[in-house]
């Protein structure tokens, strides 16, 4: 017979697993040097959703990987000259085809949010996991990206005491615009289990 709803959810969860080292079993791991230890005793309580493409609005290349591993060639594209010396990373990068690349263990602090504040608490990198979707503010994301993001989110929420999900623009308003107007928050929220975290607004003054 048909699986009950809860069993279907459980089977989805089994697709992805994060081990004690903070690594996702379905991701390709490419270590970024742009990370460090979280402050002692910090609980992971926030997911931050971003978009990124390098060069801007171009997909499938190695630009994002090069950026997160400090191998960007400033001569490769005019835009890259503005990235010289930038040291950034995210925990996860979800490509257009749904492939996941992990750059930093979830146990460690990735450098994705920059100057940021969530509900009165500064330094979001300390207590968050950063997920970059390959995309831009002017390009709709793919069906596969939503499916993978939803499954990854549920996996992370099972593993860590995550209480909130926010966009980069929510934690750095006025400075950042991603994941942008093309990201369908309603689709993302509705894909999560009904008892899952709902995105709340940033109450920071």
Task: Spell out what each predicted region is.
Residues 131:
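Conserved, mostly hydrophobic/aromatic
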Residues 1-14, 203-205:
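N-terminal amphipathic/basic-hydrophobic helices that include classical n-h-c signal peptides
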Residues 15-24, 122-128, 136-205:
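Basic/polar, cationic surfaces and motifs that engage anionic cell-wall
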Residues 7-122:
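N-terminal catalytic cores of peptidoglycan-degrading enzymes
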Residues 4, 78-79, 159, 187:
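Intrinsically disordered, low-complexity N-terminal regions enriched in serine/proline/glycine
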